[in-house]
Structures are given as C-alpha cells and as structure tokens.
C-alpha cells in the first residue's frame, strides 16, 4: 500500500467521491439508517463534492491524502489549516479495506499537516471505529443533534428589528472577522468556494454585532454570529427562505446551540441525534452551526 497526496484532478476527485459514498452507505446500512443507505446520488451534491476535493487539493496539498493498494484507491483524508486550527474535512476507507491499518496511516499523515496547530475541529459520523480513533487522537467528542422536516411557516416568528440582507464577496472581511470571533480562525479561501456553490449568503451587520449564514436548498450549511440574538435571526431567515415543498435540515448542533434547537422546534422540524462535533484544544464554537465540509 502507498500513500500519496491528492492531486487537483478529475480522476482523484472522483476516486475520493467513490470511496466516501461506499463508506457512508455501508455505515448507514450497518446502523439501520435505511434512508441514507438507499438515497440516490444528487447531481448538485456530487458536483460540490468533486469541487471541494479539488479546492482542498489546491489550498492544502500537504493535508490531502489517498491510500492505494494494488493501484486501487482504498482510503482518503482531506484536511486543512486555517489560522492555527487543524480541520479534518473528510476521512473515509472502503469497507473492504477497513480494519487493516489504512485509516490509522491516513489520519497520521493528514494530522502531520496540522503540526503546530493548538486547536483541532472535525464533524464525525456515527461510526464507532472513527469515534475511537478521534478520541485516541485527543479530540473531545460532543454528541450532535439534527433538525429536519418541512418548515411550518406559521411558526416563523416576527423577525424583530435586526436587518438581514444577501451577502457576497464584498463581505469577505466581515465573514472572516465573525469566524475569528466564533471559532478562532477565519475560513479564508473556503468562503470563495461556498459563495460559488451555495444558493445564498445571508448577512446581518449591526452596531450590536454581526453574523452570516449560508443556505443551499433546504440545508443550512454554515452559520456564525457574535451573539445568540443575531444567530437566531439569521437561522429564522434562512429557514423562511427554504423553498416550499423542500425538506429543511440542520446538522451538527451541540448542546451549546440550544437557541438553534428552539428555532427548529418553533417551525415544526423534528429533532434527532447523529454523529459528533469533535474538538481539540478548544470549546465547541458558539453561536455557530458548522459546515460538514469546512467546519
């Protein structure tokens, strides 16, 4: 078996996507999640996954690795450094190659990219094996909640006096500033990716504080704010903009994001649990809803 860096190529991006799909479908089947194990591939999601792999291969080549056995890609890890925070964006091994040390070698290689970083952050699947590996790597695992369902428009409360408006590249300084306040590090070039691939960016900027939220279809992809009041306003606005008939979903909510749970319940979303938000050298960011792909 050999480990090599992920190349910024269509072939490597497709290899990573194939491994991830196989690994996550197998996990869903083993954990009894029939909806995820049988879910068809969505073209838009596939395009985003391929583009994200190539994006990280460009921004963080030392943090993105593929494991190959007899010429076949059997595992992958995508990670990044953002201002002193090491972030593991993806860590997957083909089901047939699991339990053979592939994951350990991949994680060690990716973690070397974060050498010197005092803090670490990742969104973990419900995989018991992955949870053990992250805990051994020094991460604290915070059980995560999910919100899902159709938005009950009658539950959308009066938004109050905090204005929310569409954002864009001109707000990059504000976005990075809010990131640093919430999680201790800016997303930097990842904002360029999200602006290009998600439906919209919502921004709130007042004398009392600032915040932003990315929405893509029914998914709240990332939310950060300097106060719970602004975060609540942004989440309500994002859910109000979910197209009629589209399932809304919000993932990786820790206990610190009770404000988000309250908003979701107000609009009729169902509360569940899935996976973990794992942190090292830091508390879970708050008020904050992490991006599964960029944290």
PLM feature spans:
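A short beta-loop-alpha structural element at the N-terminal edge
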Residues: 2-18, 25, 162-174
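A short, internal acetyl-CoA/4′-phosphopantetheine-binding micro-motif in the GNAT/acyltransferase core
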Residues: 68, 91-98, 219-231, 252-254
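Conserved acetyl-CoA-binding loop-helix of GNAT-fold acetyltransferases
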Residues: 90-93, 99-112, 136, 228-241
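Amide-forming acyltransferase catalytic core, primarily the GNAT-like/NAT-type
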Residues: 136-218
């Amino acid at each position: 078996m050999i480990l090599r860096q992920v190349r910024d190529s269509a072939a490597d991006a497709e290899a990573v996507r194939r491994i991830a799909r196989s690994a996550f479908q197998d996990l869903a089947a083993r954990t009894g999640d029939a909806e995820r194990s049988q879910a068809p591939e969505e073209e838009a999601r596939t395009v985003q996954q391929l583009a994200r792999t190539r994006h990280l291969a460009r921004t963080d080549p030392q943090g993105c690795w593929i494991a190959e056995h007899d010429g076949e890609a059997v595992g992958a890890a995508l990670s990044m450094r953002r201002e002193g925070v090491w972030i593991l964006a993806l860590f997957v091994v083909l089901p047939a190659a699991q339990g053979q040390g592939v994951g350990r070698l991949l994680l060690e290689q990716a973690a070397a990219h974060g050498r010197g970083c005092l803090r670490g952050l990742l969104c973990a699947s419900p995989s018991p094996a992955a949870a053990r590996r992250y805990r051994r790597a020094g991460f604290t695992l915070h059980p995560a909640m999910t919100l899902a369902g159709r938005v009950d428009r009658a539950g959308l409360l009066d938004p109050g006096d905090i204005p929310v408006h569409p954002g864009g590249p001109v707000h990059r300084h504000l976005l990075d500033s809010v990131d640093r306040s919430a999680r201790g590090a800016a997303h930097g070039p990842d904002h360029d990716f999200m602006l290009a691939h998600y439906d919209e960016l919502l921004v709130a900027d007042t004398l009392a504080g600032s915040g932003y939220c990315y929405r893509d279809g029914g998914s709240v992809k990332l939310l950060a704010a300097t106060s719970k009041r602004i975060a609540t306003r942004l989440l309500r606005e994002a859910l109000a903009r979910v197209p009629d008939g589209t399932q809304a979903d919000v993932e990786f909510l820790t206990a610190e994001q009770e404000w988000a749970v309250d908003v979701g319940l107000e609009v009729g979303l169902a509360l569940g649990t899935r996976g973990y938000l794992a942190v090292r050298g830091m508390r879970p960011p708050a008020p904050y809803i992490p991006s599964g792909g960029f944290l």
